[in-house]
């Protein structure tokens, strides 16, 4: 039987007959390349699916007082002995682990995760604000800071423009304020003119 046939047959019997599926998968694992532990149990060869296993994350061990002292000595550039270096390397290479408990065989499989050295190297390769500014093209720089805006300073702006704007604004405000008084003045002048015309007509009639 070929490896591909064993794998497909195991997948076919996964829900119909789990015992037959585990037997076929065991034959496949013993003769072909092993499948990862994230999809099968390495002990009973049960396909992992929702409800047939329990997963928990085991964190990295915390640094002790001795390891904290060694880390301070290393950051200060002091020389460490061979034993101290080995202890420090063991701490840096420690990683978290994913613990999966199979409900069929009740055995726990351990899958290692990332260690501290890998996390430090990944953090160093991340982009920084300086590197982001280096990758900016000249076009984006020109768009971000136009010359007309960048060259304008408070000292270079003409004072006449500011004075004109202030005078125009003051004239507008004064015209708005004095408009009711101007209308009232015009009304009074019209009344005086009308009264003057009436008096002239009386004088003319009396003279006749």
UniProtKB/Swiss-Prot annotation:
Pfam families listed in its UniProt record: DUF4674 (PF15719)
Biased composition (Polar residues): 138-152
S-S bonds: none
Biased composition (Basic residues): 123-137
Biased composition (Low complexity): 153-180
Lineage: superkingdom: Eukaryota
Region annotated Disordered, chain positions: 123-180, 189-208
Family designation: Belongs to the UPF0711 family.
Protein name per UniProt: UPF0711 protein C18orf21 homolog
Biological source species: Danio rerio
Lineage: Eukaryota, Metazoa, Chordata, Craniata, Vertebrata
